[in-house]
Amino acid sequence: MPIIPKPKSQTKGSVESSKKESRVKMETSDAKYMVGNEVKTIKFLDMRGNIATSARNSLNISPGVFAVNPFLGETLAEDTFNILDYAGLGNVDACASHLSRSQELREQVTEKTLREVPISDSYVLKVVSNLQATTVQNVVSFNKACAVMSFNILRHTTDEMYDWTKNEYVSLGLKEKAAKVNPNIINRLAGQINLSPQSPYYYLVTPGYEFLYDAYPAETIAMTLVKMAYRKTMNLPDSMKDSDICSSLNAKINKRHNLAVNNIDDIIKQIGKKHIEDMYNTLTQNIAMSGKESRNVETAQSFLALIESFKTTT
């Protein structure tokens, strides 16, 4: 039987020697970094102790300087948009026509980034997709564009607006010369809550209605309450929380009132709870009869009645 030689034992000295050989020598001025699987060394040439006093280095890499420019979120650019600046700039039929096809407008703005939307013979909105900030008055986001058009209609159909200095709604004096909106133009969003085209608030139900807060605070709050109470009728996804529904209007309220120091309940009291309640009732008076689901129920009831009539004739 062949004798298998035993492996030579490694002495303590040889182990320490191999460890020393595996160590990477590191100078005080060195910095090791990885490029793929390879370790590279950059040596800083100007040192004071273990502090590099400049970026001058053995690889001649020019580092540049990262500027002190803090990210401040929403405060980077102040939103100068004021719905009141757009009073009287839109023709009611032009505005109503665009709002009747708001979904198509949204899709075109998203696809093309920029769309021109003439709201009168002399005023054209430039609608920009995902607009963050601008000081150009007629350059607006999709939601702001819809609010501007809604505002120019509501001024004529309601003949009033909220006056924050008086804390009340005041007449605009347009009743005798108020423009009439073409009744054949359909606001499909208002149709979701079965709001009559004859209602002065027919064009309140638009994307971006929250931007109307400075002119119609009770109306915008009531509209938000409708969305919260009738989310399925308004085709809102189940994933959208009540706080999500309120967030856009809350931003407009905060801009005017500073909610850090003012209480939302006091603001509601200032505007008038009765005003909000009346508007909520106006917007929801026919809502139970609206929508595809209720039409299906009505049809089913008629069909059941028809079946019963067959029984009486046989």
From Swiss-Prot:
The keyword Cytoplasm does not apply. Its main location: virion. GO terms for molecular function: RNA binding. Keywords: Capsid protein, Helical capsid protein, Host cytoplasm, Ribonucleoprotein, RNA-binding, Viral nucleoprotein, Virion. The keyword Transferase does not apply. Transmembrane segments: none annotated. Residues 1-27 are annotated as: Disordered. GO terms for cellular component: helical viral capsid; host cell cytoplasm; ribonucleoprotein complex; viral nucleocapsid. It is found in: Virion; Host cytoplasm. Residues 17-27 have a biased composition (Basic and acidic residues). Encapsidates the genome, protecting it from nucleases. The encapsidated genomic RNA is termed the nucleocapsid (NC) and serves as template for viral transcription and replication. Homomultimerizes to form the nucleocapsid. Binds to viral genomic RNA. This is Nucleoprotein. It comes from European mountain ash ringspot-associated virus (isolate Sorbus aucuparia). The lineage of its organism: Viruses, Riboviria, Orthornavirae, Negarnaviricota, Polyploviricotina.
